Amino acid sequence: MSCSGGNCGCGSSCSCGSGCGGCRMLTDLGEERSSTSQTMIMGVAPQKGHFEELETAAGSDNGCKCGSNCTCDPCNCK
């Protein structure tokens, strides 16, 4: 997920935006990766693309709060 280009910016109303690159929503994906090999079995349903997810989440400002140094705390824009 992301908001406004992947950044939670600290704007005047402490909303999602690109005011400053406080926290990137896509960094959470790195935690799901591991160094071991994994096998994925895909079903018959088409895989949802990342662009669709970005479009769905773009422009949303729920749950984005400003912390110190113009960072988001927590960075959980929905």
UniProtKB/Swiss-Prot annotation:
This protein's UniProt keywords: Metal-binding, Metal-thiolate cluster
Domain of life: Eukaryota
GO-annotated molecular function: metal ion binding
Transmembrane residue ranges: none
InterPro entries assigned: Metalthion_15p
Disulfide bonds: none
Function according to Swiss-Prot or TrEMBL: Metallothioneins have a high content of cysteine residues that bind various heavy metals.
Family: Belongs to the metallothionein superfamily. Type 15 family.
Protein name per its UniProtKB record: Metallothionein-like protein type 2
